[in-house]
Amino acid sequence: MTYEELKTTEINQLIVQTDLLKLAKECLSIVDSSTMKDKEITMLIESAIRDLERVEVDVKGHIEDNLVKNTIIIYVKAHFGDGDIDKRTEYLKRYKNNLRELQFSEEYQKKEVDSNAWC
């Protein structure tokens, strides 16, 4: 299994364990029993998680945090379907603001492990 496949599997498990798909569907006003758009929504959730990880946000360690969840959902709402361009622009602006807050907050950063440390 390649690193990318392993990472995708890990993210998909995270999505299932935390009910992010269910939450995203609820926020998009899609009934939970409908599965027609699940692949698209899951892809967007995965993209949001990867974007957060790209800027060194510890998503896995803070996945239950409402700011992290909100940031993921805003990303999904900004990129889902072909909705109102003004709303999409507003969601993207909010996403970038949240991303910046998470990126520069020490609390949400991945902890670096010093391999040279004595313990």
Locations of regions flagged by a protein language model:
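Conserved short "hinge" loops at termini or chain/domain junctions
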Residues: 1-68, 101-119
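Mid-chain, well-packed structural core segment of small domains
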Residues: 59-84
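C-terminal structural segments of small proteins and small subunits
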Residues: 82-100
